[in-house]
Amino acid sequence: MSPVLGEFEQRILFTLIRLGSDVHGVAIRNHLEESGRAVSPGALYTALDRLEKRGFVTSRLGEPTPDRGGKRKRLYTLQPSGERAVARLYESLRSMTQGLGTRLRKLEG
């Protein structure tokens, strides 16, 4: 049985597929907001922590950078279990929406 993921967690996983490995939380947040999903930093990092505990993502501390005053960024990477979850979600959405374009065009007139 596939694990249940909330809409926000799904969006985070889709974002990580798009952005690749070693992605900083700010980049994830920016991508989510560009795609129309406003998100607070607290909500994002709480969801990332949940996804990490479930084994879908891992995080590591990057190197200190001068632009951050020597602080290190936490970087996130999608794991194979997260990739499989995205593949299942994608297939489910594709199956559910098959033929929907034709129906919607008819409704538009």
Residue ranges and their predicted role:
Residues R72:
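Exposed loop/turn and edge beta-strand positions of beta-sandwich/beta-sheet ligand-binding modules
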Residues L44-T46, R50-L51:
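Basic amphipathic alpha-helical segments that dock to polyanions
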Residues L32, L61-E63, P80-G82:
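Short, well-ordered turn and helix-capping elements at secondary-structure junctions
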Residues R54-G69, T77:
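Beta-hairpin "wing" of winged helix-turn-helix
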Residues V4, D49, P66-R68:
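Short secondary-structure boundary/capping segments
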Residues S81-G109:
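Amphipathic alpha-helical dimerization/coiled-coil segments
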Residues S2-A43:
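N-terminal helix-turn-helix DNA-binding core of bacterial DNA-binding proteins
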Residues N30, E52-K53:
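Alpha-helical residues within the helix-turn-helix
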